[in-house]
Curated annotation (Swiss-Prot):
Sites where the protein binds Zn(2+): C78, C95, C102
Amino-acid positions noted as binding Mg(2+) in the UniProt annotation, renumbered to this chain: D77, D79, D81
Gene name linked to the record: hisI
Name of the protein: Phosphoribosyl-AMP cyclohydrolase
Catalytic activity: 1-(5-phospho-beta-D-ribosyl)-5'-AMP + H2O = 1-(5-phospho-beta-D-ribosyl)-5-[(5-phospho-beta-D-ribosylamino)methylideneamino]imidazole-4-carboxamide
GO cellular component, one term: cytoplasm
Length: 130
């Protein structure tokens, strides 16, 4: 029997893009990367675990901020190269800027406009030096 992780088309770095959506509203909260271990642990622990390319290690969403993403459903797209995580966003903040979503800017002819408010100051969320 084929392992479910073998069905995923990982990129040349062994990663797959993962989009987190609110399981109730469908709002896109963020995009991050997952490697095989991150996806396997996400399924096993029922919480979002990503691969941090900048830190080169697993990143359990909410490990510093407390803003954990509880997993409700995993979906794989038709090309098997993008994952969607349907999550419950604990604390209502997914973005390191203190906003609900990382997608808080809208394009207008004059450029990108910030349309979503900061819900909590990032300095109050993360330890010094973040």
């Amino acid at each position: 029997m084929k392992d479910w992780l073998d069905e995923i088309h990982w990129n040349s770095d062994g990663l797959v893009p993962a989009i987190a959506q609110d399981h109730k509203t469908g709002r896109v909260l963020m995009m991050a990367w997952m490697n095989r271990e991150a996806l396997s642990l996400t399924a096993a622990e029922n919480r979002a675990i990503y691969w941090s390319r900048s830190r080169g290690k697993l990143w359990r969403k909410g490990e510093e901020s407390g803003h954990v993403q509880k997993l409700h459903e995993l979906r794989l797209d038709c090309d098997a190269d993008v994952i969607i995580l349907m999550v419950e966003q604990i604390g209502g903040i997914a973005c390191h800027t203190g906003r609900e979503s990382c997608f808080y800017r809208v394009y207008e002819k004059s450029g990108w406009k910030t349309v979503d408010p900061v819900l909590k100051d990032p300095d109050a969320i993360y330890p010094a030096g973040h």
